[in-house]
Amino acid sequence: MSARCGSQARTLYELCDQCNITLPTLQIDCVFCKTVLKTAEVLAFAFRELYVVWRDDFPHAACPRCLDLHGKVNQYRNFRYAAYAPTVEEETGLTILQVRIRCCKCHKPLSPVEKTNHIVKKTQFFKLKDSWTGYCLHCWKKCMEKGQRSETLC
């Protein structure tokens, strides 16, 4: 892939479109450990709507292992407080459905159903630095199976 190809791309979908390649054929390195992501890892990165990182005019993504590790480091370093949906809405000036909230475990954006799940189950969202996180349904289930409370980061 040319260093110039897709230099304005923010997502893997944009990168593939600008470079005229398909997502399954994309070969991209992890920004942290420098390994080449496997096809399933590339697809998972794209599904989570994560952003491409540019280093020395080349695009990078993150492998699942590094994504998990750096996500945990981010939680510990940048946790501010936990709050219920009305507080999130008051702070942002948006409805909870308009707020971009990512899963604190897998980093995918929460769907309206997943945000509503937090409200119905009276579970808090987490403020990490300048962004809000919560749990997607998949990670919620895994966290609950471990016997951890949903009011804490697991």
Curated annotation (Swiss-Prot):
GO molecular function terms noted in the UniProt entry: DNA binding; zinc ion binding
Where is the major localization of this protein? host cell
Q: Where in the cell is it found?
A: Host cytoplasm; Host nucleus
- Keyword Signal attached: no
Q: Which terms under GO biological process does the entry name?
A: DNA-templated transcription; regulation of DNA-templated transcription; symbiont-mediated perturbation of host apoptosis; symbiont-mediated perturbation of host ubiquitin-like protein modification; symbiont-mediated suppression of host innate immune response; symbiont-mediated suppression of host type I interferon-mediated signaling pathway
* GO cellular component labels: host cell cytoplasm; host cell nucleus
Domain of life of the source:
Viruses
Zinc finger residue ranges, unnamed: 30-66, 103-139
Which keywords label this protein? Answer: Activator, DNA-binding, Early protein, Host cytoplasm, Host nucleus, Host-virus interaction, Inhibition of host innate immune response by virus, Metal-binding, Modulation of host cell apoptosis by virus, Transcription, Transcription regulation, Viral immunoevasion, Zinc, Zinc-finger
The family database entries (InterPro entries) matched by this protein are listed as: E6, E6_sf
Q: How does it assemble?
A: Forms homodimers. Interacts with ubiquitin-protein ligase UBE3A/E6-AP; this interaction stimulates UBE3A ubiquitin activity. Interacts with host TP53 and EP300; this interaction inhibits TP53 activity.
* Similarity field: Belongs to the papillomaviridae E6 protein family.
Stated role: Plays a major role in the induction and maintenance of cellular transformation. E6 associates with host UBE3A/E6-AP ubiquitin-protein ligase and modulates its activity. Sequesters tumor suppressor TP53 in the host cytoplasm and modulates its activity by interacting with host EP300 that results in the reduction of TP53 acetylation and activation. In turn, apoptosis induced by DNA damage is inhibited. E6 also protects host keratinocytes from apoptosis by mediating the degradation of host BAK1. May also inhibit host immune response.
Additional note from the record: Belongs to the low risk human alphapapillomavirus family. The cancer-causing human papillomavirus E6 protein has a unique carboxy terminal PDZ domain containing substrate but low risk E6s do not possess this domain.
The name this protein carries in UniProt is Protein E6
The protein's organism comes out as Human papillomavirus 40
